[in-house]
Swiss-Prot record:
Keyword Secreted listed: yes
Expression sites (tissue/organ): Expressed by the venom gland.
Domain of life: Eukaryota
Protein name: Short cationic peptide-6b
Main location: secreted
Secreted as UniProt keyword: yes
UniProt keyword terms in alphabetical order: Secreted, Toxin
One GO CC annotation: extracellular region
Cellular compartments annotated: Secreted
């Protein structure tokens, strides 16, 4: 598992939820 990729995914999800 790639934690970095997971972070990006979480960040993208959070950005989507914010907007």
């Amino acid at each position: 598992l790639n934690p970095f990729r997971w972070m990006i995914n979480k960040y993208r999800e959070w950005k989507n939820k914010k907007n």
